[in-house]
Amino acid sequence: MSSTGFAQDREYSAGVQYTNGPLVIAGAYSNVNGLGTSTTGAVTADTAPVVADSERIAGAGIKYAFGPAAVAFVYTYTDIGQPVKNNLVHATLNGSSLRFSNYEINGSYQFTPQFSGMAMYDFTHGDYAASNGTVRPNWNEVGLMGDYLLSKRTDVYMQGVWQHVSGVADDMGGMSGALILGSAGQSSTSSQLLVHVGLRNKF
């Protein structure tokens, strides 16, 4: 298998879900070997957020709906082995491991048949073992969204996300500045705010 690179550039995943009335419980696991290390693998160099030997992600979540409201909690653990590059900010990584523990709680409420609101809080703890020391950054993220139906197919929405990163003494691996995915780029400070306003039409 080594001659074809199958063992190196592969990905496999599995997931389960249990539903009982208003209760939903789910779990998933993903494993990638050769993350972003080639142009033909499961996760190619131009699509991988991080270039590394391996990436393992395990997660579980629970959701409960009651009346017009719903609340959910999600936990994920990511273990990246031998990371060499942070593609999100084009920074070099020289560590032996990069790990993230992510905790999110979110909720939604249907105020009227036309208007719904959503909110979330996310906390991520990182652990990056580098050749010049260990850094343990933390990310705090808060998000709000409102959606209003203009018709069965058309709605207008507004959403905002604020992120703050702490625990990084210097620019280790490009992690000192806040970075919300979907923004124009990384902030030059430890905080970032992103606001979206959109009109959507479903065909």
Question: Predicted regions: what is each one?
Answer:
Residues 176-186:
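Low-complexity, intrinsically disordered Gly/Pro/Thr-rich segments
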Residues 13-148, 159-163, 201:
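Detector for outer-membrane/organellar transmembrane beta-barrel domains
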Residues 1-19:
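Aromatic- and glycine-enriched pocket-lining scaffold segments that form the walls
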Residues 152, 160-178:
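C-terminal beta-signal and adjacent terminal beta-strands/loops
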Residues 114, 150-156, 189:
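Short loop/turn motifs that connect adjacent beta-strands in outer-membrane beta-barrel proteins
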Residues 150, 187-203:
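Outer-membrane beta-barrel "beta-signal"
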